[in-house]
């Protein structure tokens, strides 16, 4: 397994191995995705972030569903963050579904996923970081499942992608409050 990013470990949580044999900073693979544990909140629940895709699948994976939870050694971990550069350069990726516990989409998270067409943003997403979808000019549909969205960096999408949204080549669906804020942050009328 290759760690694609160094995590910032929160002050909360345990820094030692718990009874499940998991610890903050530990990386693990579930399916085609690589995760890193960011906190251990209780005896049975913690948090993790997606930090990448298994190297052998990076240029082959067409569909990614980031689930609400990814278990490691029987320990339940809520997936709350998509790490910086996690899926950058996944050239075959066409469809992305972000789970309902994810709150942050990191910098460059889906940069240069040149075939990406469909994005479903989960209920809890609050932040879409800088260049999160830069270079993804073929997006045809973005669906917002919730109304928690607060921050969309103005350079989260490329100029071409913004132009497609403005001209309605890219359809925006779902929660009206999230769509309104999304368009406002990207300065799209």
Locations of the language-model features?
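Extracellular interaction modules
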Residues: 12-19
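Short beta-strand/loop segment at the start of cytosolic alpha/beta domains
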Residues: 21-57
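Acidic, Ser/Thr
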Residues: 56, 86-87
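Conserved "repeat-terminator" motif of extracellular CCP/Sushi domains
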Residues: 1, 20-21
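Structural signature of tandem-repeat unit edges
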Residues: 1-12, 32, 39-44, 58-81, ...
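Consensus positions within tandem repeat domains that build extended binding/scaffold surfaces
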Residues: 83-86, 106-109, 129-132, 155-156
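Glycine/tyrosine- and acidic-biased, solvent-exposed loop/turn segments at the edges of beta-strands
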Residues: 19-20, 30, 88-92, 111-112, ...
